[in-house]
Amino acid sequence: MNILFLTKSFGIGGVEVVTMTLAKTFAKHGHQVGIFSFYRADDILEKQLPKDIPLYIAHGYKNSRENISMLRQLLVDKKIEVVINQWGLPFLPIRVINQARNGLKVKVISVYHNQVDTNGKLKACDQAIERCQNPLLRSVLEVKKFLVKSITSYSMRYVYKHSDVYEVLSPSFIELFKKFTGIKNPTKLVAQTNPITIDGSVQSEKITNVDKKEKEIIYVGRLDFVQKRVYRVIDTWNYLEERFPDWRLTIVGDGEDRENLENHVSCLGLKRVSFEGFQNPLNYYKRASMLLLTSDFEGFGLVIIEGMSFGVVPFVYGSYPAVYDIIDDNINGFILPMTEKGYDAAQMARKMADVMKCPERWLQLSKNAISKSNLFSLENVYSQWKNNLDKMNVGG
């Protein structure tokens, strides 16, 4: 079948990496695939695209005649049968798509790549309300949050209504979707997980030998405050560094919060913390023993399953429902439950210390993590996608 992925931008980012991975997998199975992006963020991913997967760059992120005309021409010339809208919340992409496909037999799947009932804007409102001591200003912030939530809910309903299928990343998000949007019987709603995005050829080289693993804890991801809360990773390590002198913490990623985090490390007097910046995480997955993720919310947590596929035992803050689809607590990783008191660095450190001092237990957890990660392999996820497309009577 002929498939066109649509993204807001095409540069380094989780959604974009998943898009490229799925595009390459569909192409491998004989489908004709292209990617339409409203603008080019950088050329890092573009350089990794195979020649048989064209990237079409529009005229900016806008609902314009130019963009509609360009997209319609692609739909006609390339005989596109399905558009996979990877930006399944904003109004603009679905409006452009539906104007472009008017009168054509083109199906649309919209995908929401985050936790259904929250996002960065809503969390920023929550955090501002928590910090506010002024009752009047607090009331204003509450109104702002209500408006942001209402607009987000309406936008999600709109995209759902104007798509043939709407996908969320976890079965646990289905009930959240119903509650958040007010759609009681969402017959077009499908739960579809993201795949491990590391090449199968690399996957076959996974290191599972405990002798080749290092005593290293890693964080992989963006360095921001609103969502990722990486300072919690550092606070947790603060309980561990002196007790485990042969272990180290490595932070892989970059972002606007990096300077604050580096200052936090200095203030705590920590010695074995390394900031690596943006890097391909492959070598870190190969050598690390544990992964620590302390986000306030996530869509799915791709770094968790990627790490698990290399035997990296995950320790994750249970702030979002989908993590319970990935980790079986105390079997292939650990989840620190979310409570009203918030993240407890000392309790997480105790969970990690119990494993750090017992290599035999770590080894069993590591093997179990690899086994669980197979559920999210590219081939398994592709089969789920193909099944969903077949149900829509798209292609053959």
Which residue stretches match the model-derived regions?
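A conserved mid-protein helix/loop that constitutes part of the nucleotide-sugar donor-binding site
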Residues: 16-21, 215, 224-239, 256-262
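Nucleotide-activated donor-binding/catalytic signature segment of Leloir-type glycosyltransferases, i.e.
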Residues: 54, 259-278
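Short His-centered aromatic/hydrophobic patch
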Residues: 85-92, 112-115
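A short, well-ordered alpha-helix in the C-terminal region of glycosyltransferases
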Residues: 354, 361-375, 383, 387
